[in-house]
Amino acid sequence: MNLLRTFNATLARRPLATQVIVSGAVCGAGDAFTQYLTGQKSWDYKRTARFTCLAAVFIAPPLNVWFRVLERVRHSNRHAQVFSRMSIDQFMFSPFFNAIILVNLRLLEGFSFSKSVDKMKNDWYDVYTSSLRLWPAVQLINFYFVPLNYRVILIQVVAFFWNSWLSFKTQTPALEDPTIE
């Protein structure tokens, strides 16, 4: 219980820093887990570092701000408020956010900006439509039950599995399209 109390106190004092650290750790663990499950001969620590950096720099800080923006969405009816937040998140923010994540992942891999955009275009539709099978339900739970400072952390706990899939999806060579390197 002391560890949980310390975590809660740290989150209350430094929400962004705590969210960044937890997000990076969970995302990196998701990639390492994927490498283990797919039977890679050796651990690609650089790949795990890229996923850790992706979450810590390009995911947690924007989500921290985004959830505070969504807090401003108000309705007199609690159900309408939660549904509005989820809808805005999934249909206005998520399409762009997924694209930004995919481009940044490729930039971290060392691809040029134009090649990163090409790769994003190749992966985006599948990633976004797959995200719609998971994240609306998660966000409904998030907006109904989870205090604001914990929302990024809940997202990253669920994202352990999502990031495992995303790592698999983006790190497996595309056999059907020889133009994508």
Curated annotation (Swiss-Prot):
A Gene Ontology biological process noted in the UniProt record is:
regulation of mitochondrial DNA metabolic process
One GO MF term:
channel activity
Looking at the UniProt entry, the stretches that span the membrane are 20-38, 48-70, 91-113, 140-162
Which of UniProt's keywords are assigned here? Membrane, Mitochondrion, Mitochondrion inner membrane, Transmembrane, Transmembrane helix
Signal peptide (UniProt feature, chain positions): none
Q: How does it sit in the membrane?
A: Multi-pass membrane protein
Q: Does the keyword Membrane apply?
A: yes
- The answer to whether UniProt assigns keyword Transmembrane helix to this entry is yes
Instruction: Return the GO cellular component terms, semicolon-separated.
Output: cytoplasm; mitochondrial inner membrane; mitochondrion
Per the record, the major location class is mitochondrion
Compartment(s) = Mitochondrion inner membrane
Stated role: Involved in mitochondria homeostasis.
| Family stated for the protein in its record | Belongs to the peroxisomal membrane protein PXMP2/4 family.
Q: What is this protein called?
A: Mitochondrial inner membrane protein Mpv17
